[in-house]
C-alpha cells in the first residue's frame, strides 16, 4: 500500500511511504523505540488500520504518563474567559480573521485596545461563573504598524503594548482573582522578565518550522515578520531560559509537508528537553475562514489531526501535556482522546473563541460526558499546569504565589473545586531586609569551605545536561590553526590598531616563542600608554545575597534559599561592612548579589542609599547589568529610568560583569536565564550615556574558542569608541572546580597558562588605545599567575577585596583578601612599582592612603557581622 506523501493542503511530494516502511515505523512506535523525523513523517500519513494501531500505542504512552503524574484516567481543561486586548497586529497572516484595521474598529465603536474597564468587566463576569483563567490574546506589536495604536498607548501612558499587558494583568489579579495567561505574540527576553511577575503562564504557537511558508510570496505567513520560524523558536528558547511555563504547538494543514510537520514537532521537543518549560503542546487543525486569502484552502481532515496528535504523543513522550481544541472538530472528541490527548485547553462558559468565532466551544458538561464515556474523568486545572504549580520556584514568581495558592489544590496542583475566585493584592515584597542563612560565609569560606560542591536542585535548575553537551561539543577543546604568526606580530609591533581579524586570531593561538614575543609587544604597548606603575584599589566586596534562581551553569555561588550555604544580608549588615572597610582605608565597595526573588523592588536603591548614609565618601560600585534589568523589570521602570534613580540613590559606577562571552552561541550554553548579549550592551551604553562609568570583563576558558574572545574584545572596543565609559578591562579566567557546567562534564577545566597570557596580551592590543587599563585577577590566578600577567600587558591588580565568596565558592584556592603589602609584593615580583588608585583610576586622597597604610588595607578580623 502507498499513500500520498503530502498533507491534504500541502505541496506535492514524491510517492508516500511503502507498506514496509509504515509497518516498521508502527512497530517502533508500539515498542516504545525513539522515532526519528523520517519515521514520524511516515506515521503522520497513517490511515485506516494503520492509524488505529498508531493511536492505540499513543494512548498507552499517554496513560503511562498520567499514571506517573499521579492522575490516572484524568483529562483536564481550564475554565477561562477570552480577552482580545487588541485586534490590531503588524502581521498579515493569510488565514486570520482575528486581526482587523483601525478604521473597522472605529466604525464599530471600539477603541484601538480594550480599556481596563472593558477587560475587568469580562474578568469579573468570568469570576462569578467560576472561571480561573483570563486568556489575554492580542496582535503582535501593533504600534510598529499602526500610528493609531501608538497614539492610544501614548495617550494612556504606556511605553509599548507589553507595558499595557502588564498593567492589565495586575488589575485582573488584584480586582478579580483570575490568573492571566498571556499570548502577546513574539516576545523578547526582556519582555519575559517584565511579564513573568504578573502571569503564571504564557504561550505562543510555533505553528511550523517550514521557512518557505514565510519567505515565499503567496505563503500563509508571507509578509508577517513575527512568523519567521527562527524568530518563534528564539521566543520558545527565551521562555525556557526565563523559567516561564509555556504553551506552544503546531498548526497543521496550512501547506506544510509531512516532513516539515514532523520537523516542527522535533523542534518543539528539542526546546522542551533543553529547558523542561513547555507545559502544554497544542495540535491545532486549520479551518478555512471566509474573507481571508486562504478561504479556498480545504480544512485539515480529521484523520490528519488524529495522526498528528498520535505522532506528537510518541515524539513528546508520556510526560507531555497534549491538547487539541475541541471546538475545531465536529463532536469527534472520542477520536482525539483515543489519539493521546490529555487536555481540552481553555473552555469558556462566557466568551467566544475570538480567533475562531465561527466555532463555539462545547459545553463543559458535554466534554465531561464525552470524557467519561471514554473512561476518563474531566478535572479542572489552572492556566499553569499542575507540575509547575508543585515545582514552585523558579517557575512561579513569588509575587504570584498567593494568587495561585488561592486557587490550586496543594496536593494535586489542579484547580480547587471549592476555591473562591476573588482578587488579592499584587505587590513587590515590601518587608525590610532581614539577615538569613550563612551570613558568615565571607569569613568561613577560607577555613570551613562550602557545605556541598553543588546545590540540591543541580539536576533540574540548569536544564537538560544532555542537550547542552551536544550544543557545547564544538567548544570542548579550542580549535587550533596552523598559521604563521610572524606577519601578525609585525603588525602588532608596528600598530596594533591595524590588526585584522585573521591576524588577531592567529595571535590568540600563539604558542612558544611566538607567544613570548606577543606578550613582549603587549608589555611595550602597556609601558607606552600607562607607564610602569601597577595600580590597585583598597576595596571591599559585599555580596549581599547568594540566593538566586537564574540558573547560570558556570556559577557555584548561587544557592536556593533553603540550601545550607545560602544567605542574605540585612541593610544594616551591608552598611556595617562598608563602614568597616572605610575604617581600614577603602575608597570603594563593590556590591553584587544573586537575583533573589523575595527582595523588595526597591532593594538596589535601598542598598546604595544605606551605604551612602553610613559612609558618604564611599564610592558605590555596584549592580551588574543583570541586576539592572532585574531592578528595572521589578519596578516597572525603563533601564534608563532605573539607572537614573539608582544614581540618585547613591550609585557611582557599575561593574561590567554578567558579560561572560558576548556571543549568544556560547552564552546560552553557559547561562540558562541570564540576559542576552544585546541587552548587556544596552544596559552598559545607557549607563555610559548617563555618566555612570563601568568596568568591562570577559570570562573565558569554558566552552568558548579564541574566535569568541576576538569577537568579545572587538565588541567592547566598539562600545568604548561610542561612549568612552569603560574604566578598565578585567580578565576573568573560568574557575571550574565547583562550576555546574564542569561537574556535568561539559566545560573545559578552565584556561591554560597559554590562554591566560594570550588573552591578556591581546586585550592590551585589541583594546588599544580605547581602554588603557587591563586588570588581572589574583583571586583566580594567584600571586605568581598575576605577576606573569603583569609581564603580558596588564597594569592593574584589582583590589584588596577584604572578602570574596564568588570565586571561592567556585573552587579558587587563592584566598579571599590581600593586604596592601601583599599587592605591592605581586608588583615587586613583576619588577614594577605599585600605586593605589580610585575606582575611576584617579589619585587616592592622602587621608585614605594613611588609613590603608595603618591597617595594611584589611580588616583586623574577619568575623560574621551580626545585628
Curated annotation (Swiss-Prot):
Residues 75-325, 534-769 form the Radical SAM core domain. InterPro entries: Aldolase_TIM, CofG_family, CofH/MnqC-like_C, CofH_family, Elp3/MiaA/NifB-like_rSAM, F420, FO_synthase_su2, rSAM. Keywords: 4Fe-4S, Iron, Iron-sulfur, Lyase, Metal-binding, S-adenosyl-L-methionine, Transferase. [4Fe-4S] cluster 1 binds at residues 89, 93, 96. One of its GO terms (molecular function) is metal ion binding. Catalyzes the radical-mediated synthesis of 7,8-didemethyl-8-hydroxy-5-deazariboflavin (FO) from 5-amino-6-(D-ribitylamino)uracil and L-tyrosine. This is FO synthase. The gene is fbiC.
Amino acid at each position: 500500500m502507498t499513500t500520498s506523501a503530502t498533507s491534504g493542503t500541502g505541496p506535492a511530494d514524491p510517492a508516500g511511504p511503502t507498506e514496509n516502511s509504515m509497518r516498521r515505523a508502527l512497530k517502533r512506535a508500539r515498542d516504545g523505540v525513539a522515532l526519528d523525523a523520517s519515521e514520524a513523517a511516515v506515521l503522520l500519513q497513517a490511515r485506516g488500520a494503520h492509524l488505529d494501531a498508531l493511536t492505540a500505542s499513543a494512548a498507552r504512552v499517554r496513560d503511562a504518563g498520567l499514571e506517573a503524574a499521579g492522575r490516572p484516567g484524568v483529562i483536564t481543561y481550564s475554565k477561562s474567559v477570552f480577552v482580545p486586548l487588541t485586534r490590531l497586529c503588524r502581521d498579515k497572516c493569510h488565514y486570520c480573521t482575528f486581526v482587523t484595521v483601525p478604521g473597522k474598529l472605529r466604525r464599530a465603536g471600539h477603541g484601538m485596545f480594550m480599556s481596563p474597564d472593558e477587560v475587568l468587566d469580562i474578568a469579573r463576569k468570568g469570576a462569578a461563573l467560576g472561571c480561573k483563567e483570563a486568556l489575554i490574546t492580542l496582535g503582535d506589536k501593533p504600534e510598529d504598524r499602526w500610528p493609531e495604536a501608538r497614539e492610544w498607548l501614548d495617550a494612556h501612558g504606556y511605553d509599548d503594548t507589553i507595558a499595557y499587558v502588564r498593567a492589565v494583568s495586575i488589575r485582573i489579579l488584584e480586582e478579580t482573582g483570575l490568573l492571566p495567561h498571556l499570548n502577546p505574540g513574539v516576545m523578547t527576553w526582556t519582555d519575559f522578565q517584565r511579564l513573568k511577575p504578573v502571569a503564571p503562564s504564557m504561550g505562543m504557537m510555533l505553528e511550523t518550522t517550514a521557512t518557505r511558508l514565510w519567505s515565499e510570496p503567496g505563503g500563509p505567513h508571507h509578509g508577517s515578520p513575527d512568523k519567521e520560524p527562527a524568530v518563534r523558536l528564539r521566543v520558545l528558547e527565551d521562555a525556557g531560559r526565563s523559567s516561564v511555563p509555556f504553551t506552544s504547538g503546531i498548526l497543521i494543514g496550512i501547506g506544510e509537508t509531512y516532513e516539515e510537520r514532523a520537523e516542527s514537532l522535533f523542534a518543539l521537543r528539542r526546546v522542551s528537553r533543553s529547558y523542561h518549560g513547555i507545559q502544554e503542546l497544542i495540535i491545532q487543525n486549520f479551518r478555512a475562514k471566509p474573507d481571508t486569502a486562504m478561504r479556498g484552502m480545504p480544512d485539515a481532515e480529521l484523520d490528519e489531526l488524529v495522526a498528528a496528535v498520535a505522532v506528537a504523543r510518541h515524539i513528546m513522550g508520556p510526560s507531555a501535556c497534549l491538547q487539541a481544541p475541541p471546538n475545531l472538530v465536529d463532536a469527534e472528541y472520542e477520536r482525539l482522546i483515543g489519539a493521546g490527548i490529555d487536555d481540552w485547553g481553555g473552555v469558556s462558559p462566557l466568551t467566544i473563541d475570538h480567533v475562531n468565532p465561527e466555532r463555539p466551544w462545547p459545553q463543559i458538561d458535554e466534554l465531561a460526558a464525552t470524557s467519561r464515556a471514554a473512561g476518563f474523568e474531566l478535572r479542572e486545572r489552572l492556566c499553569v499546569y499542575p507540575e509547575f504549580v508543585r515545582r514552585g520556584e523558579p517557575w512561579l514568581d513569588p509575587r504570584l504565589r498567593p494568587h495561585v495558592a488561592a486557587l490550586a489544590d496543594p496536593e494535586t496542583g489542579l484547580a480547587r473545586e471549592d476555591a473562591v475566585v476573588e482578587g488579592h493584592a499584587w505587590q513587590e515584597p515590601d518587608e525590610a531586609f532581614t539577615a538569613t542563612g550563612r551570613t558568615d560565609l565571607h569569613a568561613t569560606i577560607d577555613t570551613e569551605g562550602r557545605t556541598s560542591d553543588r546545590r540540591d536542585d543541580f539536576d533540574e535548575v540548569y536544564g537538560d545536561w544532555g542537550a547542552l553537551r551536544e550544543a557545547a561539543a564544538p567548544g570542548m577543546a579550542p580549535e587550533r590553526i596552523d598559521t604563521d604568526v610572524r606577519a601578525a606580530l609585525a603588525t602588532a609591533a608596528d600598530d596594533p590598531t591595524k590588526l585584522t581579524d585573521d591576524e588577531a586570531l592567529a595571535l590568540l593561538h600563539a604558542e612558544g616563542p611566538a607567544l613570548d614575543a606577543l606578550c613582549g609587544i603587549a608589555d611595550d604597548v602597556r609601558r607606552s600608554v600607562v607607564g610602569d606603575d601597577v595600580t590597585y584599589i583598597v576595596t571591599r566586596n559585599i555580596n549581599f545575597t547568594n540566593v538566586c534562581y537564574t540558573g547560570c551553569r558556570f556559577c557555584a555561588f548561587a544557592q536556593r534559599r533553603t540550601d545550607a550555604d545560602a544567605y542574605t544580608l540585612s541593610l544594616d549588615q551591608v552598611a556595617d561592612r562598608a563602614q568597616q572597610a572605610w575604617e581600614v582605608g577603602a575608597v570603594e565597595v563593590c556590591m553584587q548579589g544573586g537575583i533573589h526573588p523575595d527582595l523588595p523592588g526597591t532593594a538596589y536603591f535601598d542598598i546604595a542609599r544605606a551605604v551612602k548614609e553610613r559612609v558618604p565618601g564611599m564610592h558605590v560600585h555596584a549592580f551588574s547589568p543583570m541586576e539592572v534589568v532585574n531592578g528595572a523589570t521589578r519596578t516597572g521602570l525603563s533601564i534608563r529610568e532605573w539607572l537614573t534613580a539608582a544614581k540618585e540613590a547613591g550609585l557611582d559606577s557599575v561593574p561590567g560583569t554578567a558579560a561572560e562571552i558576548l556571543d549568544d552561541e556560547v552564552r546560552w550554553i553557559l547561562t540558562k536565564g541570564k540576559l542576552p548579549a544585546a541587552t548587556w550592551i544596552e544596559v552598559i551604553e545607557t549607563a555610559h550615556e548617563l555618566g555612570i562609568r563601568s568596568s568591562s570583563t570577559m570570562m573565558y576558558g569554558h566552552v568558548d574558542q579564541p574566535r569568541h574572545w576576538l569577537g568579545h574584545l572587538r565588541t567592547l572596543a566598539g562600545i568604548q569608541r561610542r561612549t568612552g565609559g569603560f574604566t578598565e578591562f578585567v580578565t576573568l579566567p573560568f574557575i571550574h572546580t565547583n562550576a555546574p557546567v564542569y561537574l556535568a562534564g561539559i566545560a573545559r577545566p578552565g584556561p591554560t597558562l597559554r590562554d591566560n597570557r594570550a588573552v591578556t596580551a591581546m586585550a592590551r592590543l585589541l583594546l588599544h588605545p580605547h581602554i588603557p587599563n587591563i586588570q588581572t585577577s589574583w583571586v583566580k590566578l594567584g600571586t605568581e599567575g598575576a605577576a606573569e600577567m603583569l609581564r603580558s600587558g596588564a597594569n592593574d591588580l584589582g583590589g584588596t577585596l577584604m572578602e570574596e565568596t564568588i570565586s571561592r565558592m567556585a573552587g579558587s584556592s587563592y584566598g579571599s583578601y590581600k593586604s596592601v603589602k601583599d599587592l605591592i609584593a605581586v608588583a615587586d615580583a613583576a619588577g614594577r612599582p605599585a600605586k593605589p588608585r580610585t575606582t575611576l583610576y584617579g589619585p587616592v586622597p592622602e587621608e585614605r592612603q594613611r588609613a590603608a597604610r595603618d591597617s595594611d588595607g584589611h580588616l583586623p578580623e574577619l568575623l560574621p557581622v551580626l545585628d
